[in-house]
Amino acid sequence: MKTIIAEKPSVAREIARIVGATKREEGYFEGGGYAVTWAFGHLVQLAMPDGYGVRGFVRDNLPIIPDTFTLVPRQVRTEKGYKPDSGVVSQIKVIKRLFDTSEHIIVATDAGREGELIFRYLYHYTGCTTPFVRLWISSLTDKAIREGLRKLEDGSKYDNLYLAAKARSESDWLVGINGTQALSIAAGHGTYSVGRVQTPTLAMVCERYWENRRFTSEAFWQLHIATDGCDGEVVKFSSSEKWKEKEPAMELYNKVKAAGCATVTKAERKEKTEETPLLYDLTTLQKEANAKHGFTAEQTLEIAQKLYEKKLITYPRTGSRYIPEDVFAEIPKLLAFIGTQPEWKDKVRAKAAPTRRSVDDGKVTDHHALLVTGEKPLFLSKEDNTIYQMIAGRMVEAFSEKCVKDVTTVTAECAGVEFTVKGSVVKQTGWRAVYGEEKEEITIPGWQEGDTLTPKGSSITEGKTKPKPLHTEATLLSAMETAGKEIEDDALRQAMKDCGIGTPATRASIIETLFKRGYMERCKKSLVPTEKGLALNSVVKTMRIADVAMTGEWEKELARIERGELSDDTFRKEIEAYTREITSELISCDKLFGSRDSGCACPKCGTGRMRFYGKVVRCDNTECGLPVFRLKAGRTLSDDEIKDLLTEGHTKLLKGFKSKQGKSFDAVVAFDGEYNTTFVFSEAKKDKKFSGRKK
């Protein structure tokens, strides 16, 4: 008998149908000489510190660096601590029995780093020695599964993939466990979660937040003239320079207004080609789904995974935006299929050779770019259909013709002021026709250098400089992809992918972790760090744990392990040294977290004392631990203001707060019924009964 192990029951069911394993047993399907079983995600994990006989959150025990990591069944948290998940333990027993009684194992977990780790951890935990082969496929269509089963690969081919996954798992444990415990010990109260990837990601969110909030807008003035264009249209020139002072701008404006003519000093005409966009990888799909439809990164990944399991798209957790030659041969057939759908009727070119920009064998990693499979998308929800049609539409764009424009730039001088105007006319719409996104054309007459223009009007406008906007999930994903470097070019971004932080498969969960930890929140599409997030970042922002570039280097090292260019032992030694350094740094934060008595009892429990710990005031009763963060809407509460809040349940009216939109406001800070702080505004204060009890 052969055992096939899939990553989840739904995939196992499809494979079982294809191999004829139709008899349902407890935890697997059987038939046709096969047993088809499944995991449900990671059934086996690295043990927590107590699994090594080490008590956690003890200063003298840090750093905790096991000689060898111990694997245990996935655990769940209970009132008495962590214990193995009973359902997981039962499934592991089923899998072990099947492994031990099989002639060989076919590994059908997801074809990627985490899928490989799910199987290998199980294999090692069960002490299995049965030989295994790998089913490596990029879609779950019947055709792909059958072809994959005919072309099974030796399991050892993916040893480096496993070693990279194992190194990632162990490094996250070392940094996360030691960093979190060190900082929490330094703080004295509460738990401050840090991680190899989550903390640098939070640092980027906080850095952009402060850059936005501390930005001082400055006024500027710009001049404009208008003249007749083609077919009665008006062409509007704008001054090349912008003035920070109104007086000199007005002085020049009056001269321009009085002038009767302008002279063309330069006329430049060029043909501009806009290449087709590359196909989607997961991160680009997540970015555009967030920007265009407001989907979270996690939501997009969940939908893409669902579409994959429904056989509608190829493997979603891909980091490549290219396809190999053999897949390109199937593109005409797939485009013809897309063209039969109502959404894309008349958008797919008939009998035309697809553009090859997204075709490059050398740029395909484990999986090629996202494609639809040719299976009909029936009975999809609105959200699922949105993601499916995005992938289909991108395929149509990527394999259409280039967009070609004639671009004209004209410079003219009037009363000593230089003015410019740019116009474009589309010669070949190409891929821009797919969504009809091409902007309205601006036709510039055939002016030549030395031509005299007669202005039909002039104006002066006032503008204001704007800060960089707060991060959205789309822009944060871009920053994670390039370790904070601002790169717009698709090809350059693709070249940087090994230096980013996180991977396409993990970035969504990293962002969600920051929400779950209470470090940031969504304000419409913007990501805003919470008081807790800002407080944490203020402590660690200059430390190595928050270094975005270095985290990008770790990802690069993991990619080298995957390619067989770096030993996992070398990486392990480096990450252990790093763990010792960041643990020492974070433990020393007790200087920053030095506590002192506020002189106030806890308003919530009444038995504890409220103590100042740097950016937070916290109850010293461990069963209560009420936290009050001093930083509120860009303003830090003083000791006296905190004492008013603790003793009266509210402060006096305070000035100098700044809203998430950057507007200043005045308010009272008060406790609500759950002892969370809230703002009460002056007009409402007269009728407001504060919920927090006075002690």
Regions from the PLM with identified roles:
Residues 1-169, 173, 179, 467:
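Intrinsically disordered, low-complexity regulatory segments
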